[in-house]
From Swiss-Prot:
Source species, domain of life: Eukaryota
Matches recorded under Pfam families: Toxin_cobra-type
Location of this chain's protein in the cell: Secreted
Family matches, as InterPro entries: Snake_3FTx, Snake_toxin-like_sf, Snake_toxin_con_site, Toxin_cobra-type
Protein name: Weak toxin NWT
Single GO molecular function: ion channel regulator activity
S-S pairs: 6-11, 17-33, 37-48
Gene Ontology cellular component list: extracellular region
Tissue-specificity statement: Expressed by the venom gland.
Main location: secreted
CDD domains: TFP_snake_toxin (cd00206)
Family according to the record: Belongs to the three-finger toxin family. Ancestral subfamily. Orphan group II sub-subfamily.
């Protein structure tokens, strides 16, 4: 299994997982604030600030 290992949306750093290695999956992209806060997608946590700036 090959995993991407950087927090950016477009990532080219990979790590080959060894047999039995625990897999951790977290996605974190800054996509907007307040009025532009995106709708949550399945299996995604979206945290937004309450006001701009």
């Amino acid at each position: 299994l090959t995993c991407l290992i950087c927090p950016e949306k477009y990532c080219n750093k990979v790590h080959t997982c060894l047999n039995g290695e625990k897999i951790y999956d977290q996605r974190k992209y800054i996509r907007g604030c307040a009025d532009t806060c995106p709708v949550r997608k399945p299996r995604e946590i979206v945290e937004c600030c309450s006001t701009d700036k």
